[in-house]
Regions:
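Helix-loop-helix hairpins and the membrane-proximal interhelical loops
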Residues: 1-46, 145-194, 212-215
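Membrane-embedded alpha-helical segments of transport systems
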Residues: 59-66, 85-101, 119-126, 155, ...
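Interfacial loop-to-helix junctions that mark the boundaries of transmembrane helices
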Residues: 1-7, 109-121, 175-181, 221, ...
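Non-transmembrane accessory domains of multi-pass membrane transporters/channels
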Residues: 311-350
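Structural signal for the N-terminal portions of transmembrane helices
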Residues: 116-120, 149, 249-262, 281-313, ...
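Hydrophobic core segments of alpha-helical transmembrane domains in multi-pass membrane transport
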Residues: 9-21, 53-57, 125-137, 150-162, ...
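Hydrophobic alpha-helical transmembrane segments of multi-pass integral membrane proteins
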Residues: 42-69, 185-208
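Membrane-interfacial helix-loop connectors
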Residues: 69-91, 99-121, 159, 196-233, ...
C-alpha cells in the first residue's frame, strides 16, 4: 500500500467515525430525552432491564453512551446499582446492531430488490432526503431526522472507502504476517482491546475489522480473539466517566468491566478447550462481514444469558473492589444530597 492508499484508508476511517458520531447525536436529539426517562422508570426486573438496555443502545448506536448514562443515573441516585446491571448487559447486545447493518454491504446478488438492501445502494438516497430535510424543513424533528440520514450515509461511505483502500493489503506479506500473529488468542485480544480503547467505540472497531475482511487475508482464527478484546476495550469510556463520580457510579463502571472480562475469559477457555479436541474448521476460512456480525452477537447474547443470574455477584465484586468508607457527618451528607441530582453526564444529551 502506497502513501495515497494509506491516506485513503485514514480518510475512510475519519468519515466512518464522523458518520457514526453524527448519526448517534441525531438519534439522541430526536429522542428528546425520552430514553433517559424510560431508563429512570426502570423496574427491578432484570430481563426488562436487559431488553431496555439493548433497545436504547440499538437506537443510539453506542453501548458506551448507554453505559455512561447509567453511570450518571447511579451517580445521581436515580438508579440503584442492581438495576444498572441488566442495562449494562443489554447494552452489549444492542451495540451489535451496527455490525449487522455494516454486514449488508457484503450482499452478493444480481437481483434488483436484493441490491436495494445494500446500504451502499440506499445511503445516497438517504443523504439526499436528509439534506432536503435540513435545508428546507422548519421543524426541528425533521432536521434531526435529516442529520441521522446524513450520518448513516457518511458512515457507509467511510466503510466502503476503507474496504476499497485495504484490499491491496492482501498481497503484502508483512500484513498477512501481522494478522497471523494476531491469531494467537492473547495477542488478538490485546490488539482488539487497545484499538477499541483508543477510538472508544466497539461498534467502530468491529466495523474496521469488517472492512479488513475485504482483503481476504483475515481468517476467523484471527478475527475471533480480536472481537473478544474489543468487548473489553469498550469499557474504557465508562471507566473514564466514573472519574470524580460517587462510589456507586464507579462500581457501575466496574460492573461493566467485570462483566466483559469474565464473559470473555470463560468464552475463550471453553471455546479453545473444545477446539483443541474437536477442531472448528470455520477458523481456517476467510472471515467476512456477516460472520463477524454473527460472532459479535452470539458472544454478547451468550455472555448475558450466562451471567445475568449472577448479576448480584458482579455487584458484590464491584463493592469489594471499592468498599464503603466510614459514614460521614449528617451535615456533609445533606450537602452532598442537595447536589447529587445535578450530573454533568446528562448535559450532553438534551
Amino acid at each position: 500500500m502506497d502513501f495515497f492508499g494509506v491516506l485513503t484508508m485514514l480518510g475512510g476511517l475519519a468519515l466512518f467515525l464522523y458518520g457514526m458520531e453524527t448519526m448517534g447525536k441525531g438519534l439522541e436529539k430526536l429522542s428528546g430525552g425520552r430514553l433517559e426517562r424510560i431508563l429512570e422508570k426502570l423496574t427491578s426486573n432484570p430481563i426488562k432491564a436487559v431488553l431496555l438496555g439493548a433497545g436504547v443502545t440499538a437506537i443510539i448506536q453506542s453501548s458506551s453512551a448507554t453505559t455512561v448514562m447509567v453511570v450518571g443515573f447511579v451517580n445521581s441516585g436515580i438508579m440503584k446499582l442492581t438495576q444498572a446491571v441488566g442495562i449494562i448487559m443489554g447494552a452489549n447486545i444492542g451495540t451489535t446492531v451496527t455490525s449487522w447493518l455494516l454486514s449488508l454491504t457484503g450482499i452478493e446478488s444480481g437481483n434488483f430488490f436484493v441490491q436495494l438492501l445494500k446500504p451502499t445502494s440506499f445511503s445516497p438516497v438517504l443523504a439526499l432526503i436528509g439534506v432536503c430535510f435540513i435545508m428546507f424543513s422548519k421543524k426541528e424533528k425533521k432536521k434531526d431526522a435529516g442529520t441521522i440520514m446524513i450520518g448513516f450515509a457518511i458512515l457507509m461511505t467511510g466503510m466502503e472507502t476503507m474496504s476499497g483502500a485495504v484490499k491491496p493489503l492482501a498481497n503484502v506479506p508483512e500484513f498477512t504476517g501481522i494478522l497471523t500473529m494476531f491469531s494467537n488468542p492473547v495477542l488478538g485480544m490485546i490488539a482488539g482491546a487497545v484499538l477499541t480503547a483508543i477510538i472508544q467505540s466497539s461498534s467502530a472497531s468491529v466495523g474496521i475489522l469488517q472492512a479488513l475482511c475485504a482483503t481476504g487475508a483475515v481468517n476467523f482464527s484471527t478475527a475471533l480473539p480480536i472481537i473478544m478484546g474489543q468487548n473489553i476495550g469498550t469499557c474504557v469510556t465508562a471507566m473514564l466517566s466514573g472519574i470524580g463520580a460517587s462510589k456507586n457510579a464507579k462500581r457501575a463502571a466496574l460492573v461493566h468491566l467485570y462483566f466483559n472480562i469474565i464473559g470473555t475469559v470463560i468464552f475463550m477457555i471453553v471455546f479453545y478447550t473444545i477446539n483443541a479436541v474437536v477442531h472448528f474448521s470455520f477458523l481456517d476460512t476467510a472471515a467476512n462481514a456477516m460472520g463477524i456480525a454473527v460472532i459479535h452477537s452470539s458472544f454478547n447474547i451468550a455472555a448475558t444469558i450466562m451471567l445475568l443470574p449472577f448479576g448480584s455477584g458482579l455487584v458484590k465484586l464491584a463493592c469489594l473492589t471499592i468498599p464503603e468508607e466510614k459514614k460521614e457527618a449528617p451535615a456533609q451528607n445533606q450537602e452532598k444530597d442537595a447536589f447529587r441530582l445535578l450530573d454533568q453526564r446528562f448535559l450532553d444529551t438534551p
